[in-house]
């Protein structure tokens, strides 16, 4: 079984806190050091026993030396600063992971900031979260049964990747691997686009002169569709900008589909409108059931 003496979590929020709790639950880490720019977050993490030691950003390079595992759980646009912060504390065998929702950009800054230590960085993206953020929402079970996507680097050794897989398995997760470019394209479609739509809908309705009436009658359908608009604006701003090209491609495809749908409604094309909705309902039901047999990728 894997075992780590010292875990350093940079960014003590929902994901970083849940990771620490999951490894504590699995009894594979002896000490957790939390590093954050927010004193309030660090105090909450100590009070909730998510971390054992709290360090400010300025104290981290010295206080966190000797770490054998480092997790970067900060917004993707803060990754460059995070890599620069941790480089001095990396031993020869320290493993570094991120939790970023975009990969090509994070890998780029890792190469720049880590230099000869880049082989110690194994990019990871846990597909888990909640619409609430902050360490108070951290949960040891957050990753149970969830996918974690690794996008290994050419510089990574097989042993480093295997150890990272073991780490996430200890958290209760399932592990899959793909290229960084494939990752960014996939999640632009199924994660980043839905978040943008939820933010846009709530913002548009809230700006209307009759917003009070609209929200007073909003019910379960609106709540379900817009749940993810409660997510961290800072995190999702960074994701949108860092995965801009892939996200714009998906937004254009969605706009085209919405225009098509508008045309069906405008022309009262009941047959095609019904067919579109039926296809959508059936595809969603198959996805929920885990029946992906009728879905095809171009390469298969």
Identify the residue ranges that each predicted region occupies.
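Residues at the starts of beta-strands that form the adenosine-phosphate
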Residues: 6, 31, 120, 147, ...
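Conserved short alpha-helix immediately C-terminal to the canonical SAM/SAH-binding motif I
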Residues: 40-41, 78, 103-106
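Rossmann-like NAD(P)-binding element
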Residues: 59-97
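Internal alpha-helical scaffold of NAD(P)-dependent oxidoreductase catalytic cores
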Residues: 142-227
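Interdomain hinge/lid region at the active-site interface
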Residues: 211-280
């Amino acid at each position: 079984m894997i075992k780590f003496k010292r875990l350093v979590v940079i960014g003590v929020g929902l994901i970083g806190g849940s990771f620490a709790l999951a490894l504590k639950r699995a009894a594979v880490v002896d000490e957790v050091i939390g590093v954050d720019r927010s004193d309030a977050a660090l105090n909450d993490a100590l009070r909730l026993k998510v971390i054992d030691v709290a360090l400010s950003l300025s104290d981290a390079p010295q206080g966190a030396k000797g770490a054998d595992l480092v997790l970067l759980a900060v917004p993707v646009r803060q990754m460059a600063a995070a890599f620069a912060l941790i480089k001095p504390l990396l031993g020869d065998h320290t493993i570094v992971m991120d939790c970023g929702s975009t990969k090509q950009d994070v890998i780029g800054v890792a190469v720049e900031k880590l230099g000869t230590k880049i082989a110690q960085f194994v990019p990871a993206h846990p597909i888990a979260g909640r619409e609430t953020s902050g360490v108070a929402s951290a949960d040891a079970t957050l990753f149970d049964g969830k996918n974690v996507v690794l996008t290994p680097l050419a510089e990574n050794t097989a042993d480093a990747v295997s150890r990272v897989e073991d780490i996430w398995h200890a958290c209760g997760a399932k592990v899959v691997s793909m290229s960084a470019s494939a990752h960014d394209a996939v999640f632009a479609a199924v994660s980043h686009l839905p978040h943008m739509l939820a933010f846009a809908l709530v913002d548009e309705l809230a700006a209307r002169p009759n917003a009070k009436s609209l929200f007073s009658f909003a019910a379960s359908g609106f709540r379900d569709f817009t749940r993810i608009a409660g997510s961290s604006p800072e995190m999702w701003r960074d994701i949108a900008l860092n995965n801009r090209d892939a996200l714009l491609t998906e937004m254009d495809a969605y706009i085209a589909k919405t225009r098509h749908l508008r045309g069906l409604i405008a022309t009262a094309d009941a047959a095609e409108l019904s067919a579109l909705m039926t296809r959508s309902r059936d595809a969603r039901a198959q996805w929920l059931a885990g029946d992906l047999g009728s879905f095809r990728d171009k390469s298969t």
